[in-house]
Amino acid sequence: MATELDKIFLILEIAEFIIGMLGNVFIGLVNCSEGIKNQKVFSADFILTCLAISTIGQLFVILFDSFLVGLASHLYTTYRLGKPVIMLWHMTNHLTTWLATCLSIFYFFKIAHFPHSLFLWLRWRMNGMIVMLLILSLFLLIFNSLVLEIFIDISLNIIDKSNLTLYLDESKTVYDKLSILKTLLSLTSFIPFSLSLTSLLFLFLSLVRHTRNLKLSSLGSRDSSTEAHRRAMKMVMSFLFLFIVHFFSLQVANWIFFMLWNNKYIKFAMLALNAFPSCHSFILILGNSKLRQTAVRLLWHLRNYTKTPNPLPL
């Protein structure tokens, strides 16, 4: 039977699901309608749409996972149900993270200005480089899936012990295997984080250089390029902040799950963990002029609709 904590946890998870769905469905619908209308799909819109679709899939997996943890946590230890849910969550999370990273890199090459020949060469081949990053992410996904499968097999075989911590103390070999596998899974998460952090640092350097050139030419410090730099930096910084919260929450959740199974604190870690797919879409909407203007028009129409008095029945 669900406790009060379980009910609060499920209510908050459903709220995160609704918030995330609203933002990502909006992004997908706007970009698809624009692509159909213009008969052309731009690279940024394509990445945004793929990111929205991937996040929608992740949100559904998260919702199912939350109901499983909140209402039937004992089923999580079953090999037939626990393994597919964990694998699906990691796959959708991997795709979402890498697509968000590709979007950060795309904005960097689209907005930043450097006279260096290497930067110009990479910028000229930006679309091909994004494709190569996506191919790299697929290879890493295969590697992660193989490592994760071994990790789950070992964990689910021992998680039904009455005292997992004591069992791991007695079996140092198993503990060492779990530690190595967990380290490998964590290291692969640092690759998209480091790429996004590098993009942010170079965006900042480009903004400083651009602002200094404007001051030297007596044109002030605000123009369209400066604003584009700042918007892109805010988007990448917000992504990095959410990613840091997401990454550390994942480590805490894994530790609680495998060392203190069925502990109530895993629910708080899951709430923080799932903030990334729920909130990131609204950061993307605010940072994209087309999406932001469409959202403002939609809210304006909804406001006018709610204020329109209903006609009296005859």
UniProtKB/Swiss-Prot annotation:
Pfam families tied to this protein: TAS2R
Subcellular location: Membrane
Record topology, Cytoplasmic segments: 29-50, 123-127, 209-238, 287-314
Glycan attachment sites: 163
GO CC aspect terms: membrane; plasma membrane
UniProt GO molecular function: bitter taste receptor activity; G protein-coupled receptor activity
Keywords, ordered alphabetically: G-protein coupled receptor, Glycoprotein, Membrane, Receptor, Sensory transduction, Taste, Transducer, Transmembrane, Transmembrane helix
Domain of life: Eukaryota
SUPFAM superfamilies cross-referenced by the UniProt entry: Family A G protein-coupled receptor-like (SSF81321)
Coiled-coil residues: none
InterPro entries xref list: TAS2R
Function comment: Receptor that may play a role in the perception of bitterness and is gustducin-linked. May play a role in sensing the chemical composition of the gastrointestinal content. The activity of this receptor may stimulate alpha gustducin, mediate PLC-beta-2 activation and lead to the gating of TRPM5.
Family: Belongs to the G-protein coupled receptor T2R family.
The protein, known as: Taste receptor type 2 member 42
Organism: Pan troglodytes
Protein encoded by which gene: TAS2R42
